[in-house]
Amino acid sequence: MVRRFLVTLRIRRACGPPRVRVFVVHIPRLTGEWAAPGAPAAVALVLMLLRSQRLGQQPLPRRPGHDDGQRPSGGAAAAPRRGAQLRRPRHSHPTRARRCPGGLPGHAGGAAPGRGAAGRARCLGPSARGPG
């Protein structure tokens, strides 16, 4: 024998009208000493499902007065970014503009191929001026 219960929940909200949820619960009713309890078990089951569903949707609780400015305080979420905004180059200048004439910065000892001592001297700085 299957018992059907119609469970209506009124969820109070901080702003706006209360939200009304209606569930139909089917509970198989066994006969004998191991019989399933009636209406209280159905209500407890629905409340447990509703709480677990609600816990998965809520963000972490924030303490009042500890807003670090990282999250928007309004209810509207930020608009999703489009692909063109996400695919910017990591550096604003092309590769050659980041290099000094003698090769990569920080690699002053090894000059770029095809360049002489003058190219290296431009990268090394004041110690490469020679005697005097």
From Swiss-Prot:
Record keyword tRNA processing present: no
Region: Disordered, residue numbers: 56-132
UniProt protein name: Tumor suppressor ARF
Signal sequence residues: none
Annotated spans, Interaction with CDK5RAP3 and MDM2: 1-64
Post-translational modification: Ubiquitinated in normal cells by TRIP12 via the ubiquitin fusion degradation (UFD) pathway, a process that mediates ubiquitination at the N-terminus, regardless of the absence of lysine residues. Ubiquitination leads to its proteasomal degradation. In cancer cells, however, TRIP12 is located in a different cell compartment, preventing ubiquitination and degradation.
Lineage: Eukaryota, Metazoa, Chordata, Craniata, Vertebrata
Description of how the protein assembles with itself and partners: Does not interact with cyclins, CDK1, CDK2, CDK4, CDK5 or CDK6. Binds to BCL6, E2F1, HUWE1, MDM2, MYC, NPM1/B23, TOP1/TOPOI and UBE2I/UBC9. Interacts with TBRG1 and COMMD1. Interacts with CDKN2AIP and E4F1. Interacts with CDK5RAP3 and MDM2; form a ternary complex involved in regulation of p53/TP53. Interacts with NOP53; the interaction is direct and promotes ARF nucleoplasmic relocalization and ubiquitin-mediated proteasomal degradation. Interacts with TTF1 (via the N-terminal region (NRD) and a C-terminal region); the interaction is direct and inhibits the nucleolar localization of TTF1.
InterPro entries named among the record's database cross-references: Tumor_suppres_ARF
Biased composition (Gly residues): 103-117
Record GO terms (molecular function): disordered domain specific binding; DNA binding; MDM2/MDM4 family protein binding; p53 binding; RNA polymerase II-specific DNA-binding transcription factor binding; SUMO transferase activity; ubiquitin ligase inhibitor activity; ubiquitin-protein transferase inhibitor activity
GO annotation (BP), single: autophagy of mitochondrion
Coiled-coil zones: none
Amino acid composition bias (Basic residues), ranges on this chain: 84-99
Organism this protein belongs to: Homo sapiens
